[in-house]
């Protein structure tokens, strides 16, 4: 159906001429940012120069961490229902002496190396991801402004920007007043040009690839696995199963150190023929072709992801570009935005100091550089054959999955003073099984609490009855209006003035269960005590009011802390994006030291 008929993904009426955040680009990165800002109750306008969302092709692979993120956002179900899943990878190779043959097969995300809750790649074209995020935004009253090409940005006063864009449907220039501008507008980002000294650094290689999405007719036996093919005469191919019985082929047209194939020559027919030569003696024909693309591999990172005033930012491909061979682009891009959204929310609301925004560049530029370093080695391994590629996968599989994307010590990731716990600051919280005390439901600790831009303060209490005095003292101190209680009061006032952006679906999530104590902190307790060992009424008021986040442990304590003694309490501070901010253990007589440690972590918050 034509966009003009069903209006899907369109702005209704004129965009507002003043907002808080303008996002340029409605691909996965821009939509992830705008969607989260809308959820947090922040006014946002999202501009896109296309008339509609992506219909076919482009990014297609969701890694385990991205699947987890969509589950945390309660948006994963349509993708889990309709996308293809890949659990394994096989390696094929030919030599001058032997025809094409399978040389190895392995689990894509081994439990002992990755430990992901969803140990597979989820395959669906980019438009399916965009549609889910668009639908969620629209349910909260935010619509993409289409046919809107970003033109320029200027500063009109302290903290005031004027964003100009071209309305392509009327050929007129329109302006929006905003406090922040975020460019999610791709590798040729125009927003990036308004950030001083932010040009891309790195290499444009000679490696070029053709990409085909379609339904294939073949006698190749591993059609429904991820397959890396290396031939001695016709380069490499990467096979990826897709939704609706399709397969994506990445077909190598020229190597990194070879002569680049002219883009005009790299037609659909040329790429098909190249693939047929590589797959000989197997039959390879296309029943349909839904999408075709080709690209030259560039491996570059922007020198800066934000301007000195922390008013203009870039995310996604605007900040980094690389090959598509490891399905990292959309995954990394969406997590750029996921990182930025909660920080913007806290600063805009006056709940955190503006310096918090500097951690966006520190953290996400590190991940971008880690990605490029991996991608360089990954592309080399593809050219070297099965043994090198298998080694590269094993060495980097945690990073590829997203689980191993780790941040350095800094404002938000406080060193644990040599504490040797399985979970460390700067790492994603580890999956763990627990049972909710209040209703006896078994849940995943990393998924159960909805994303409401709250820090989660987990108290791991091996034995509740012997720890009641510790819990009472700590809870009273945390609720004190001279400490975290004061920050909670400020957050409550902010969210009364500008509430969360709720949708009808939130009625079933019941976010009010998690904001009873605070809009900015969620307090949770995980215990190895039996349900019959204590009543909620035995707990201090702070934890009584947190009844939906009281958990009976299955394996979370061991996964996060290892062994905790009965006379110890473990505390883990988890950031709104699921990363561990700090972790520590104390004796039952150290409630005051525990409180000071928690308050010291939150020094970046406004009093």
Regions found by a protein language model. Name each.
Residues 1-22, 36-40:
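Extreme N-terminal leader/targeting segments of oxidoreductases
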Residues 135, 142, 159-161, 180, ...:
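Conserved FAD-binding catalytic core of PHBH/FMO-like flavoproteins
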Residues 17-19, 170-180:
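Core beta-strand elements of the Rossmann-like FAD/NAD(P) dinucleotide-binding domain
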Residues 146-161:
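A conserved short coil-to-beta-strand element within the FAD-binding core of flavoproteins
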Residues 55-138, 157, 231, 240-241, ...:
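Active-site-adjacent segment of FAD-dependent monooxygenases/related oxidoreductases
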Residues 36-59:
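Glycine-rich FAD pyrophosphate-binding loop
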Residues 2-4, 12-14, 104, 345-480, ...:
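C-terminal helical "tail/cap" subdomain of flavin- and related membrane-associated enzymes
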Residues 26-35, 39, 133, 183, ...:
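Conserved mid-domain beta->alpha element of the FAD-binding
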């Amino acid at each position: 159906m034509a966009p003009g008929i069903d209006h899907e993904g369109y702005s209704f009426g004129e965009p507002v001429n003043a907002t808080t955040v303008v996002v340029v680009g409605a691909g996965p990165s821009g939509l992830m940012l705008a969607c989260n800002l809308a959820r947090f109750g922040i006014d946002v306008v999202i501009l896109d120069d296309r008339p509609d969302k992506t219909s076919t092709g482009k990014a297609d692979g969701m890694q385990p961490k991205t699947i987890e993120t969509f589950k945390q956002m309660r948006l994963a179900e349509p993708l889990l229902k309709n996308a293809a899943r890949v659990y394994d990878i096989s390696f094929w190779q030919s030599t001058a002496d032997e025809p094409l043959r399978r040389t190895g097969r392995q689990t894509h995300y081994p439990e002992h190396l990755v430990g992901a809750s969803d140990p597979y790649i989820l395959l669906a074209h980019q438009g399916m991801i965009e549609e889910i995020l668009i639908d969620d935004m629209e349910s909260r009253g935010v619509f993409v402004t289409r046919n809107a090409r970003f033109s320029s940005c200027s500063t009109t006063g302290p903290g005031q920007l004027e964003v100009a864009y071209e309305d392509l449907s009327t050929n007129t220039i329109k302006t929006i007043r905003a406090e922040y501008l975020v460019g999610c507008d791709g590798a040729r980002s125009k927003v990036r040009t308004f950030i001083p000294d932010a040009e891309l650094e790195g290499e444009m290689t000679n490696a070029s690839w053709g990409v085909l999405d379609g339904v294939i007719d073949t006698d190749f036996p591993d059609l429904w696995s991820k397959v890396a093919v290396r031939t001695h005469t016709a380069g490499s191919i990467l096979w990826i199963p897709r939704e609706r019985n399709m397969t994506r082929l990445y077909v190598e047209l020229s190597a990194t150190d070879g002569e680049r194939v002219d883009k005009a020559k790299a037609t659909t027919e040329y790429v098909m023929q190249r693939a047929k030569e590589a797959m000989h003696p197997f039959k390879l024909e296309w029943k349909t072709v839904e999408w075709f693309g080709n690209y030259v591999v560039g491996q570059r990172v922007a020198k800066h992801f934000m301007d000195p005033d922390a008013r203009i930012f870039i995310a996604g491909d605007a900040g980094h570009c690389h090959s598509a061979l490891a399905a990292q682009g959309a995954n990394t891009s969406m997590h750029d935005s996921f990182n930025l959204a909660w920080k913007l929310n806290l600063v805009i609301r006056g709940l955190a100091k503006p310096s918090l925004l500097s951690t966006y560049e520190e953290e996400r530029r590190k991940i971008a550089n880690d990605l490029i370093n991996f991608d360089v080695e990954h592309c080399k391994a593809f050219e070297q054959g099965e043994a090198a590629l298998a080694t590269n996968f094993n060495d980097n599989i945690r990073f590829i999955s997203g689980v191993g994307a780790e941040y350095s010590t800094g404002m938000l990731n406080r060193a644990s003073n040599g504490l040797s716990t399985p979970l460390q600051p700067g790492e994603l919280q580890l999956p763990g099984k627990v049972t909710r005390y209040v209703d006896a439901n078994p849940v995943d600790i990393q998924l159960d609490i909805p994303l409401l831009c709250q820090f989660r303060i987990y108290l791991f209490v091996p034995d509740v009855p012997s720890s009641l005095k510790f819990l009472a003292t700590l809870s009273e101190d945390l609720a004190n209006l001279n400490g975290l209680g004061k920050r909670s009061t400020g957050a409550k006032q902010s969210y009364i003035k500008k509430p969360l952006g709720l949708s009808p679906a939130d009625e079933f999530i019941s976010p009010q269960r998690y904001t009873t104590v605070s809009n900015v902190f969620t307090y949770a307790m995980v215990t190895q005590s039996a349900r019959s060992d204590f009543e909620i009424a035995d707990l201090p008021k702070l934890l009584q009011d947190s009844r939906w986040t009281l958990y009976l442990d299955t394996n979370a304590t061991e996964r996060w802390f290892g062994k905790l003694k009965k006379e110890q309490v473990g505390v883990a501070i988890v950031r709104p994006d699921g990363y561990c901010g700090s972790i520590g253990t104390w004796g039952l007589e150290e409630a005051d030291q525990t409180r000071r440690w928690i308050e010291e972590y939150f020094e970046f918050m406004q009093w």
